[in-house]
């Protein structure tokens, strides 16, 4: 029984952990001033705009390409918005009249 007389009987103690012990958590401050938040939001928006200008790492060709894409997209939108649904249906029916019977499908009606 002499071999078991030196046995640790309590919980194990790890080096360095006993020094830390249980610490209380710090409470978060909930009473932040709304004016400070609004001011911070305003400055953050300005900072984002400045960063966009400063961090534009596109080549001039890339910038021109994207600008032209936006321009073409706007042209497509305006072109589609210029006609009413009735006009589109009439144009489609005219197109169907010019096709041969191989592509024959019934005419589309805009009223039912």
UniProtKB/Swiss-Prot annotation:
Residues 45-58 have a biased composition (Basic and acidic residues). One of its GO terms (molecular function) is RNA binding. Induction: By etoposide, puromycin or carboplatin. Keywords: Apoptosis, Cell cycle, Nucleus. Residues 23-58 are annotated as: Disordered. GO terms for cellular component: nucleolus; nucleoplasm. InterPro entries: FAM32A (IPR013865). It comes from the Eukaryota. One of its GO terms (biological process) is apoptotic process. Expressed in ovary, with isoform 1 being predominant. Isoform 1, but not isoform 2 or isoform 3, may induce G2 arrest and apoptosis. May also increase cell sensitivity to apoptotic stimuli. Belongs to the FAM32 family. This is Protein FAM32A. It comes from Homo sapiens.
């Amino acid at each position: 029984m002499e071999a078991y007389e030196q046995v640790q009987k309590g919980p194990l103690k790890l080096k360095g952990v006993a020094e830390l012990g249980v610490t209380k958590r710090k409470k978060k401050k909930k009473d932040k001033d709304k004016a400070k938040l609004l001011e911070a939001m305003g400055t953050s928006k300005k900072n984002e705009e400045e960063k966009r200008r400063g961090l534009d790492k596109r080549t001039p060709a890339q910038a021109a390409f994207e600008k032209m894409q936006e321009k073409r997209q706007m042209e497509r939108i305006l072109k589609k918005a210029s006609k009413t649904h009735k006009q589109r249906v009439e144009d489609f029916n005219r197109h169907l009249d010019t096709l041969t019977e191989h592509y024959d499908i019934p005419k589309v009606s805009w009223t039912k």
